[in-house]
């Protein structure tokens, strides 16, 4: 069956939380803060693929969520960044927001557009260390990723 319209929910990945950690070694009784930062979440991208000619892939599956960023670790270890989620659409697709405004007109092969922005990773307690605050006992949580409903419409060009 030919599908020329789809409404899907996309959510970018949340940022990972920063770590609250202190250096501990045998002969270092009071090591300073060493909490690492959280990783960034993954973005949601739409990419034009010449192999597709309908929006059939989005007929039954409507929710697409990118992976979250990883938590920071001790010893200033940075959390893993979430991978971007790439959704393939046929050429001639028009992307519209919830209010009906056109976000993108995808025509050229391999053209990409970001439809949901990822959340930033939180900072660990090592990032808050200063001359006056030498042992910060707090860390940031990661920011949430953007989420939205979008409509995909396929412009059909008749060959005569």
Model-flagged regions — what are they?
Residues 1-160:
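Conserved P-loop NTPase architecture
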């Amino acid at each position: 069956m030919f599908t020329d319209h789809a409404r899907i929910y996309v959510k970018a990945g949340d940022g990972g939380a920063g770590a609250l950690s202190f250096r501990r070694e045998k002969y270092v009784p009071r090591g300073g803060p060493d909490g690492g930062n959280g990783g960034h979440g993954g973005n949601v991208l739409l990419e034009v693929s010449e192999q597709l000619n309908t929006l059939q892939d989005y007929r039954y599956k409507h929710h697409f969520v990118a992976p979250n960023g990883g938590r920071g670790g001790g010893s200033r270890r940075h959390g893993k960044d979430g991978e971007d989620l790439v959704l393939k659409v046929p050429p001639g697709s028009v992307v519209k927001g919830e209010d009906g405004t056109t976000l993108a007109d995808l025509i050229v092969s391999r053209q990409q557009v970001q439809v949901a922005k990822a959340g930033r990773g939180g900072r660990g307690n090592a990032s808050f260390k200063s001359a006056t605050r030498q042992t910060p006992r707090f860390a940031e949580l990661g920011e949430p990723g953007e989420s939205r409903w979008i409509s995909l419409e396929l412009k059909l060009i008749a060959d005569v």
